[in-house]
Amino acid sequence: MGAQWKVKHKEAAANAKGKIFGKLVKEITIAARNGADTATNAHLRLVVEQAKKASMPKETLDRAIKKGAGLLGETVQYHRVTYEGFAPHQVPLIVECVTDNINRTVAEIRVAFRKGQLGASGSVAWDFNHVGMIEASPDTPDADPEMAAIEAGAQDFEAGEEGATLFLTDPTDLDAVQKALPEQGFTVLSAKLGYQPKNPVSGLSDEQMAEVEAFLEGLDNHDDVQDMFVGLAG
């Protein structure tokens, strides 16, 4: 489970896609504050690529960019906020939210942490490495992730989901590595900054794991939650 927890069971494909679009629109809006040109705005370029891979309609994508760049005259201001704490059984996690109302979000996150423990800033961040995370799939069966990591400038790599590879980078190298991976035989599926646990919790029973997953799913269902990084082995 490690770096990033993902919901295992989506209720419906349409709802799942709608939620993905909602998260991407917020991310695009924030990124576009630094300019609407993807050629000069690396963060925006990364998120736009993710939106295209998710088949976001062009109209939705363009509107989000213009909204973030202030070209539509709208005043909605999104803020990125990070919460730290523990899931049941002292599993550390970092929760990233994007919200237009911080007071509302923190109150609702406190409620969501009822069965866990919401901590102060820095309470678990020390137990994670801040890294770039690039999920990429091999173009051919013989593509070598170790060689690709070395040649592209990644710090490390690990097996991802469905045959993909997760390449880990220094945060400042994220854009350069994701640009270099296609030359090494890998198609980039997503690229972002995230947190890698240093000491993931292991040895939980099936019952304990079920409690942790139920807690995480409840958090993930919150509209303002963009990402969760969980110190859980498996």
UniProtKB/Swiss-Prot annotation:
Compartments where located: Cytoplasm
Entries under InterPro entries matching the protein: Integrase-like_N, TACO1_YebC-like_2nd/3rd_dom, TACO1_YebC_N, Transcrip_reg_TACO1-like, Transcrip_reg_TACO1-like_dom3, YebC-like
Biological process (GO), any one: regulation of DNA-templated transcription
Pfam family, one: TACO1_YebC_N
Transcription regulation in keyword set: yes
Single GO MF descriptor: DNA binding
UniProt entry tagged with the keyword Protein biosynthesis: no
Swiss-Prot/TrEMBL keywords: Cytoplasm, DNA-binding, Transcription, Transcription regulation
GO cellular component, one term: cytoplasm
Family to which the UniProt record says this protein belongs: Belongs to the TACO1 family.
Protein name: Probable transcriptional regulatory protein Pfl01_3677
Organism: Pseudomonas fluorescens (strain Pf0-1)
